[in-house]
Amino acid sequence: MSDGEEKPDGFSFAGIAAGLKDSNKKDLALILAPENSICSGLFTQSIVRASCVDICEQRIKKSSGLIRAILINSGQANACTGDYGIQHTLFATKEVSQLLGINEEEVLMCSTGVIGIPIQIKNLIDNLPNLVKELKTNSLQNAAEAILTTDLVDKKITIETFIEGRKVKISGFAKGSGMIYPNMATMLAFLTCDVGVDKEEWDKMISIAVKKSFNAISVDGETSTNDAFIGINSGKKIDKKFLSKIQSGIDIVCQSLAKNIARDGEGANCLLEVLVEGAKSNSDAIKIAKSICNSSLVKTAINGCDPNWGRIISAAGNSGIDFKLDFLDLYIGDFQILKKGKLNKYDSKKVANYMQTRMNGKYLVEDIVSISLHLNSGSEKGTAWGCDLSKKYVEINSEYTT
């Protein structure tokens, strides 16, 4: 596993500053895939959507997934911008296709930033030639930086494995910090893989990975207009019996990026990891874990290092999943709080100290507050991730457009 510059064979990445942000930071990225690449995408479930989301879905469907390039801008979401939004997306993708010498229908576009603000289209178009030239540099790092908005850190990962003596690489990069909620959290994420997989199989693999990762995170319960996860594969095909190994790799990449997004929640001090075990189904377990991660009362208790277990149980009860309180075991870290639904003897000061230590721990290593809920009603389990909710979150979002 690496967060360096290793990349899947045949793919090129670029990221530059095009003047779309006042900060002069990188704000325009491009991914170029080999010919005959296969693409799958999952997008926001909000009925209020940016035009680029609709265009992405239409082009993936119309081309049966034969996509060559993805243009990504940050700074303006280009959502709720009427005909301008559609025209700007179509104009930009057409220019990219001409510069790359490919079909316009093979180009997707994703945008992120302030809703209601049109793209600074002149700056974008004027800088496209430079962006295409930067593909020669082939920097995954630059692309990862260019899609960020309120993120504090970039989010990228590459993993390698060997199948039949062949090195296989899967890379991913993402953005997301605020407006994060399960079911395609407010985020953009892109995955590339240098193994060829048929469209139908690839759709299934992407859907499985997203269910266990991006659809299992929450920062603030808000869903965006621009959410997108796009995965592209290209390369020599492998025996189908090895597809499970590719699935495992995709799962690792997606979960790593999802946890990075949750940890980088606006104003967050720790990652919250909730494991639900002993459920009747994986789906039930994830729903309960999500409900706990999404509870503002749980998140503020975590921020205050308050082992308020009642909030955890209450959030689980609001999940819509049936379970018996008398069967429950609850742990915060290694401390058992409930045993068969009844309060267990524990030292609240030690639990609070555990939470405080995690709040100050090393980033994504020792800063994880773990909650485990054992339903003792089945054999399935599921995990969701979130973060604490701090005063800093309010400060950031009360001043976002000013």
UniProtKB/Swiss-Prot annotation:
Transmembrane segments: none annotated. Pathway: Amino-acid biosynthesis; L-arginine biosynthesis; L-ornithine and N-acetyl-L-glutamate from L-glutamate and N(2)-acetyl-L-ornithine (cyclic): step 1/1; Amino-acid biosynthesis; L-arginine biosynthesis; N(2)-acetyl-L-ornithine from L-glutamate: step 1/4. GO terms for biological process: L-arginine biosynthetic process; ornithine biosynthetic process. The active site is at residue 186. The record marks 185-186 as: Cleavage. Keywords: Acyltransferase, Amino-acid biosynthesis, Arginine biosynthesis, Autocatalytic cleavage, Cytoplasm, Multifunctional enzyme, Transferase. It is an enzyme of class 2 (transferase). It is found in: Cytoplasm. It catalyses: N(2)-acetyl-L-ornithine + L-glutamate = N-acetyl-L-glutamate + L-ornithine; L-glutamate + acetyl-CoA = N-acetyl-L-glutamate + CoA + H(+). It comes from the Bacteria. Catalyzes two activities which are involved in the cyclic version of arginine biosynthesis: the synthesis of N-acetylglutamate from glutamate and acetyl-CoA as the acetyl donor, and of ornithine by transacetylation between N(2)-acetylornithine and glutamate. This is Arginine biosynthesis bifunctional protein ArgJ. It comes from Prochlorococcus marinus subsp. pastoris (strain CCMP1986 / NIES-2087 / MED4). The lineage of its organism: Bacteria, Bacillati, Cyanobacteriota, Cyanophyceae, Synechococcales.
